[in-house]
Amino acid sequence: MDNIDRLNYLYKQKKTLEFKINIVLTEMGLVKNKDGKYEELIKQYNKFNQELYDVEIEIVTRGGV
């Protein structure tokens, strides 16, 4: 998988996680955390964000793909 494919994959995963986080927040009514779902999603989201950032930096520092 090249960097562009990786970037596209990560962006897709990020959007999916944002959607799931919004569903969990809606289900919780922003009041309480059910079964630790929110924390787990936030961990995943942060992990993908970090990987996305790393790939973007790698692309920029290498001057392209």
Per-range role (PLM):
Residues M1-I4, V60-V65:
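Short acidic DE-rich linear segments
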Residues M1-D2, N33-G36:
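Short coil/turn linker and secondary-structure boundary residues
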Residues N8-Y11, D35-Q50:
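Short, charged, amphipathic alpha-helical segments
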